[in-house]
């Protein structure tokens, strides 16, 4: 849209029209930027994620899996102390490798306990998934639930094959 506007302003002969369009565009950009800045200053979009991130880091749970919307954010909130790979869903446990380090998905990358982090909605939707039945529930706050497994292999063995 901006390149088209530049062509319009270049061809427009009436100075008032050029001024009016430029002023209108400037006002729109300033209002949009102001709204975005105010949103960042007044709303903590990660407020609900902080308690579970602190729990994971504070208890030494340093590797696990979660769905895409939570994985990278928790890693960022813990300054990399907690590494989380992406999965598509808790039933099939297929790796969703978008926007995360490939090392998380390499066999043998992590030795030791592995967790599965789910939202309350995911937990309810996949209540019958083997991973939820076989993992040890170590955290629940009404928003997030964490299940613990002895190893990544144990977690991945809970995957249900797609039909």
Regions found by a protein language model. Name each.
Residues 16-18, 40, 131-132:
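N-terminal secretory signal sequences
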Residues 9-18, 46-51, 55-58, 79:
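Short, structured coil/loop segments at alpha-helix boundaries
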Residues 6-36:
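Signature aromatic-anchored transmembrane alpha helix within multi-pass, membrane-resident enzymes
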Residues 1-3:
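Membrane-embedded alpha-helical segments of integral membrane proteins
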């Amino acid at each position: 849209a901006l390149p088209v506007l530049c062509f319009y302003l270049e061809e427009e002969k009436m100075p008032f029209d050029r001024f009016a369009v430029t002023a209108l565009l400037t006002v729109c950009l300033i209002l949009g930027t102001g709204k975005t800045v105010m949103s960042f200053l007044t709303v903590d979009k990660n407020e609900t994620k902080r308690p579970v991130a602190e729990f994971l880091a504070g208890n030494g749970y340093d590797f696990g899996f979660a769905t895409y919307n939570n994985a990278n954010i928790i890693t960022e909130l813990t300054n990399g102390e907690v590494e989380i790979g992406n999965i598509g869903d808790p039933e099939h446990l297929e790796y969703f490798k978008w926007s995360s380090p490939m090392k998380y998905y390499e066999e043998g990358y992590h030795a030791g306990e592995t967790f599965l982090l789910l939202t309350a909605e995911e937990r309810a939707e996949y209540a019958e998934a083997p991973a939820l039945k076989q993992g040890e529930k170590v955290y629940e706050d009404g928003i997030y639930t964490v299940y613990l497994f002895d190893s990544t292999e144990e977690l991945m063995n809970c995957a249900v094959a797609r039909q």
